[in-house]
Amino acid sequence: MIRFLIPTAKEMKPSKEVPSQKLSEKSEAILTEMAKLSTDDLSIAYKIKPEQAEKEKQRWDAILAGEAKNYPAVELFNGLMYRHIKRKDLSTCEKDFLSHQVFITSSFYGIIPAFYPIQEHRHDFHTKVKVNGQSLKNYWRAEYDQFLEEGQVPVVSLLSSEFEDVFSPSLRKQLFTVSFMEDRNGILKTHSTISKKARGAFLTAVMEESCQTIDALRDLSFDDFYYRKDLSSDSELFFVRKVKKV
């Protein structure tokens, strides 16, 4: 069995509403701090325009008042990676895989199962707020580390460094990482758009093939991406797609 870690997304699209889940004490402490911030404060914290900050202020107030609607996390997040993850018309095995083997790393909720009920919000590890005098990364580090220590199974990271940096350096080394590149006339290139789309397509392929070992991941091909043994190591998997000359 393998576990997969994926990041949150700024873009959200409400889906079917589900019953709420009581916030953890750690999330409650963050909520308390976020609810204290004015619209201007949020504009600075998020580096967004005042009108956007007003929307976020309303969201935090709704969560604080217990009035915010709840949605399955993997269905609510709708960034580029999520749009390339198969989320509809899932077989029983595929839904079981998403439910038990895919976890989302959140700076508000901690590490949560894919279908965990969450509210619309904007929050990541770049958010300029301190909780109990700690940065968000330091605040969550012990709980993130505990996830790796308790699991006793291989964990594959589809995270950016923003999220991986939350783990202690010694435990971070335990993560298996996956990188995606394009071969353009013999030159290997990567950028965020390639990576985000490929992460979603990769996870979909893993789910459809029901991969349960790291070796099984190396046998995958998807969206014209193939495993490159020459670029990879024991803990780093590289997949490359050849782009035809135009």
Curated annotation (Swiss-Prot):
InterPro entries given in the database record: YaaA
Protein origin, superkingdom: Bacteria
GO CC annotations, alphabetized: cytosol
GO biological process entries: response to hydroperoxide
Originating organism: Streptococcus thermophilus (strain ATCC BAA-250 / LMG 18311)
Name of this chain's protein: UPF0246 protein stu1967
Family as reported in the entry's similarity comment: Belongs to the UPF0246 family.
